Design a protein with these regions (language model features):
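HotDog/MaoC-like acyl-thioester-processing domains
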Residues: 2-4, 68-69, 79-133
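Hot-dog-fold acyl-thioester-processing enzymes
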Residues: 1-58, 112-133
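Residue-level recognition of well-ordered beta-strand positions that form the cores
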Residues: 9-11, 60-62, 76-78, 92, ...
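Hydrophobic beta-strand-centered segment that forms part of the acyl-chain substrate-binding groove
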Residues: 39-87, 103
Length: 133
């Protein structure tokens, strides 16, 4: 069971370019995290976001192709599975012009109570917002 794919398109800004004249590898991770946050915000209420937060347990990222200033990219993200307080989120960053995969990544997230910062089981209410049956 996985979630629908959340998509976000953007243009590579000058601030993302490194000394090798392509996107700095750390920036891709930042874009993945931005997409995860946007997906969370798009599905949840303000009240839910005040009750719960997510923290990263680990990241895995694989760089497939470089990208450059001014290119249009699309970040795709989806939740592949979850159990207890943990959720595995996947990402692809794809160049719009030729559909080449630039980055593939996975993040293991932990669901927390926003007041105590203790891990808490992902509620049915939250999982139903994201997961396809």
């Amino acid at each position: 069971m996985k979630s629908e794919i959340f998509k976000h398109r953007f243009i590579v800004p000058a601030s993302a370019i490194d000394d090798l004249n392509h996107v700095n590898s750390v920036i891709y991770l930042h874009w993945c995290l931005e997409a995860a946050e946007a997906h969370w915000i798009s599905k949840t209420s303000e009240k839910q976001r005040e009750q719960y937060v997510w923290v990263v347990l680990n990241h895995f990222i694989s760089y497939k192709n470089p990208s450059f200033l001014g290119e249009e990219l699309e970040t795709q993200t989806w939740i592949d599975n979850y159990q207890g307080a943990k959720s595995e989120r996947h990402y692809k960053i794809i160049r719009s012009s030729d559909k080449k995969i630039i980055v593939e990544a996975t993040t293991l997230w932990c669901f927390l109570n926003a007041k105590t910062f203790h891990p808490t089981k992902i509620t049915e209410e939250i999982s139903n917002l994201f997961m396809q049956i």
